[in-house]
Design a protein with these regions (language model features):
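Short beta-strand scaffold segments in enzyme catalytic cores
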Residues: 24-34
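Flexible, active-site-adjacent loop/turn segments at secondary-structure boundaries
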Residues: 22, 35, 49
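Zn2+-dependent cytidine deaminase-like catalytic core
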Residues: 38-135
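Conserved hydrophobic/aromatic pocket- or pore-lining residues that grip, position, or stack substrates
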Residues: 9, 25, 58
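Residue-level recognition of the N-termini of beta-strands and the immediately preceding loop/turn
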Residues: 22-24, 70-71
Length: 164
């Protein structure tokens, strides 16, 4: 089950990458039905929107659905603090992550868990989707390090550091 939805999140990340954007995709799924409520990818470059991360795009696409207490957010990369806050705010009880290798710390995972949110990190040795997420993010970081830092709030300010 996790592989299917993470594969879709990866496809969305790849879509963002081919549009010269940051390769992060996310899918919000209803646990009871398996229905995809919303999906999206990072849109910083494409839409000039610094808060349109993959998770935010998925939440936006899900619209005004009110019972998110039985959903799972699949994300190709460990969420940043902004997206972590949105996950907590909307009461999403489970987050499945494809890539933590390209994150600089586990702060957001620890925060989610401290709020009672189940966090599942897929193992890239057993999940092809997770391995793909890690490889794509690493490639992007090598090719466009400035854009990677900008997306995580690093920009030109040396006091800021990306969490993810």
């Amino acid at each position: 089950m996790h592989e299917k939805h993470m594969t879709r999140a990866f496809e969305l990340a790849l879509q963002g990458y081919t549009q010269t954007g940051c390769p992060i995709g996310a899918v919000l799924v209803d646990n009871a039905t398996g229905e995809v409520w919303g999906e999206g990818h990072n849109g910083l470059v494409q839409e000039g929107n610094p808060i349109l991360h993959g998770e935010m795009a998925a939440l936006r696409a899900a619209g005004r659905r009110t019972h998110r207490h039985d959903t799972t957010m699949y994300t190709t990369l460990q969420p940043c603090f902004m997206c972590t806050g949105a996950i907590v705010q909307f009461g999403i009880p489970r987050v499945v992550i494809g890539d933590t290798a390209n994150a600089s710390s586990d702060e957001t995972i620890r925060f989610l868990r401290s709020r009672g949110i189940e966090v599942i990190v897929l193992d890239p040795t057993t999940s092809e989707a997770a391995a793909n997420c890690i490889a794509l993010a690493a490639r992007f970081r090598r090719e466009r390090p400035e854009q990677w830092l900008e997306d995580w709030g690093g920009g030109p300010n040396p006091r800021l550091r990306p969490v993810c």
